[in-house]
A protein has these predicted regions:
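N-terminal phosphate/diphosphate-binding loop that engages ATP/GTP or pyrophosphate donors
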Residues: 1-54
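Conserved, well-folded catalytic cores of nucleic-acid-processing
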Residues: 7-8, 28, 68, 82, ...
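Active-site phosphate-binding and catalytic loops of NTP-dependent enzymes
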Residues: 16, 31-34, 87, 146-153
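Glycine/charge-rich, flexible interdomain linkers and switch-proximal surface loops
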Residues: 24, 38-41, 92, 98, ...
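NTP-dependent small-molecule kinase module
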Residues: 43-53, 59, 121-127, 146, ...
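Residue-level signature of catalytic and energy-coupling elements of molecular machines
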Residues: 46, 75, 89, 140, ...
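ATP-dependent NMP and nucleoside kinases share a basic, alpha-helical "lid"
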Residues: 50-62, 66-127
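Anionic, Ser/Thr-rich low-complexity intrinsically disordered regions
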Residues: 94-95, 101, 108-118, 127-139, ...
């Protein structure tokens, strides 16, 4: 939704035109669609987004957009609707506490901010997305602060979630542990 806001000129100097974004929400529909590499991904209005969602500009908007009550309500409805069609594995900062509080399996993956920033920075560099490590680290820390202190659906571990510190694990090790 942050990408949509940018593409439709609803963001000016980091400030979102909330009224216009709220008007657009009913037209934003989510579905499952085959992605560029053949995997099934979530699509918005039949478009699958990839690398364009990993930019610093989008990352800086995520927590701001997530704090808008109408956006949270719309996303909640859309995410729950998607799960009715098939079993899903979703990640997100409130998936186990708000979106699917009764999910059969919940994992709360965590790592030190510096480790998460290194991972994000390496991913961005590998994909040619410009950013400095300092910028990425600042974004990780700020998102954690904003998400854990927001009024609506703050970042929190669900009581029944298994917490896993992935600081010393690679993707394959985490996947093997979860399976």
């Amino acid at each position: 939704i942050g990408h949509f806001a940018l593409q439709h000129n609803l963001v000016d100097k980091g400030i979102i035109d909330v009224a216009e974004l709220e008007k657009a929400l009913p037209g934003l529909q989510f579905s499952w669609k085959e992605g560029r590499e053949g995997q099934i991904q979530m699509a918005m209005n039949d478009s699958v987004y990839g690398e364009e969602l990993r930019t610093s500009e989008i990352s800086n908007l995520v927590s701001i957009v997530a704090a808008i009550p109408a956006v949270r309500t719309h996303l909640l409805e859309q995410q729950r609707s998607l799960s009715k069609a098939t079993s899903v594995v979703m990640d997100g900062r409130d998936i186990g506490t708000v979106v699917f509080p009764n999910a059969a399996h919940k994992f709360f993956l965590n790592a030190e901010p510096e480790i998460r920033a290194k991972r994000r920075y390496a991913e961005m560099q590998a994909k040619g997305i410009p950013a400095s490590f300092e910028e990425v680290l600042a974004n990780v820390i700020e998102r954690d602060r904003m998400d854990s202190t927001r009024t609506i659906a703050p970042l929190a571990k669900a009581e029944d979630a298994v917490e896993i510190d992935t600081s010393t694990m690679d993707v394959k090790a985490v996947f093997q542990l979860l399976c």
